[in-house]
UniProtKB/Swiss-Prot annotation:
The gene is HINFP. Keywords: Activator, DNA-binding, Metal-binding, Nucleus, Repeat, Repressor, Transcription, Transcription regulation, Ubl conjugation, Zinc, Zinc-finger. Residues 371-516 are annotated as: Interaction with NPAT. It comes from Bos taurus. This is Histone H4 transcription factor. It comes from the Eukaryota. Transcriptional repressor that binds to the consensus sequence 5'-CGGACGTT-3' and to the RB1 promoter. Transcriptional activator that promotes histone H4 gene transcription at the G1/S phase transition in conjunction with NPAT. Also activates transcription of the ATM and PRKDC genes. Autoregulates its expression by associating with its own promoter.
Amino acid sequence: MPPPGKVPRKENLGLQCEWGSCSFVCSAMEEFCEHVTQHLQQHLQGSGEEEEEEEDLLEEEFSCLWRECGFCSPDNSADLIRHVYFHCYHTKLKQWGLQALQSQADLSPCILDFQSRNLIPDIPDHFLCLWEHCENSFDNPEWFYRHVEAHSQCCEYQVVGKDNNVVLCGWKGCTCTFKDRFKLREHLRSHTQEKVVACPTCGGMFANNTKFLDHIRRQSSLDQQHFQCSHCSKRFATERLLRDHMRNHVNHYKCPLCDMTCPLPSSLRNHMRFRHSEARPFKCDCCDYSCKNLIDLRKHLDTHSKEPAYSCDFENCTFSARSLYSIKSHYRKVHEGDSEPRYRCHVCDKCFTRGNNLTVHLRKKHQFKWPSGHPRFRYKEHEDGYMRLQLVRYESVELTQQLLRQPQEGSGLGASLNESSLQDIILETVPGEPGPQEEAEEEGGGGEGIALPASQGTSSPIIHVVNQTNAQGEREVVYYVLFEAPGEPPPASEPPSGGVMGELQGAAEEPEVQMV
C-alpha cells in the first residue's frame, strides 16, 4: 500500500530489518516498509503451501519472525500484519532515539534489559482515523500517522472574535482550537497515542524527546543524582525531575463522598471503587468468590491450586502455602523475631518489624486516629533508615480554593467541609527562604520542608491552612508558598483587595506553585 499524506522530513536513518536472519538496511521508511511487506507475503504464502497438520499450520502462519519478539496470533493473519508493520514504525522511533542520545554528550546509554527492545504493544484493531467525514483505516501505523498529520496541515484557519484566526480540531467529539497548525498537530497525538521516539536499548516509547531523555537520566548513578526530595528522600539527576516527582506528593483531588484527598485521578478512582462501591466485577470460576480488582482475584485463585504457590525464603525453612495470607501469617508467627525492626514510633521510639504492628501501637498506646477520609497511616523512611509516621500532607492551592468555594455555591458537599481538614485560612508574609541546594525545615510543622528558591530579600506570601485532623486528631499546619513568575514584580506583602479568596484565585493562575 503506498504511503498517503506528506513525506516526513529527511533523516539519516539506519533502518535495519530484523526479520529472521535478514540484514537489509536502508534510510527511507517507504523502502523499508516495502521490503518488510515482501517478507510478510512470502511468510504467509509459503506457510499455506506446506503440507502440515492444521494446528501446526496456524501456529507457523501467524508467528512473527522478528528477532527478540516471539509474537503469535491465534486468530488471523490481519493481527500479524499490523504487528509486523508496527515493528517497522518502532524501528524508526529507535533510530530517532539513538540520534537524540548521541546529541547528548553527557548521557550514558540505557542500562535496562536489551532483550525487551523489540517487544511492542498488542494491536487488536485497525488504526482508525476519526477526523470528521473520514474514518479511513490502516494496518501500518506509519501511514496512519502521516494521514492524520495531513489533516492538520490541510485544516483551514477560521475567524473567531476580532482578528483571531484559529484552527479547529476535527477529531470526533473534540472542540479544541489552536493558534496554528503545528499546535494542532501536537494535540492530535493525544487522540492517536502517537509516540515520536523510542529507546534504542530497551525499546520503550515516548511522546517527546524530553521524556525519553528523562528515562535515561533516571538511570544515573547515585553520585550524579544531586537533587533530593525532602519529603521521601529520593534522589534525581535534574531539578526538573525532582519537581515532577514532588507533584506526586501534593493532593489535587478530593473524594465527593468523604474527606479523602489524593494526588492522582487514578488514586481517586481506586478509592471510589474500594470505599464507596459495592460492585465486585471479578468473579472466581471455581467458587462463589468475587472481588473488586484483578490482583485480589489472582491471590484467591492461588488457594485453588494443587501445588503450593508460596514458599518461605528463610534459610533452612521448608514451609509452603497456597495463599499469600498463609505465608504472611507464617512469617509473622515464626520469623518475626529474625528480622531487623524497620518501623519506629516517633513518640516513644519503640521499634517493630512490620508497619501493621506500629499502626496498632499508635492507635492503642497513643490514641492516634487516621487522618479524616484516609483508611490508614503512611510511613516515611528517615535518614537513620527507620520508617516513621508521615506527619505532613500537602494539599494543592486549587483544591483549597475548591473546598472554600463549595459552601458559597450551596454545593451538596458543604456539609463535608465542616468535617474536612480545612478549618481556617490566614494570609501573612515571611522573609526569604534558602536556595534550592538547601533544605528548609519548618519548626513545629511536624516534618521536613521542600527546598525553595532564594527570594532575594523580598517577602513571599504564604497561606497557612490549619488542618483540624492530623494523625493525633489535633490541628496541624500546611504551608503554601506562592512564587512570582520569572521577570514579574514580586507579590505585594499585603493581602489583595479580594481578600484571601482573591489571593487563592491568583495562586491558581500562577505558572508555578510550590509547597513547604
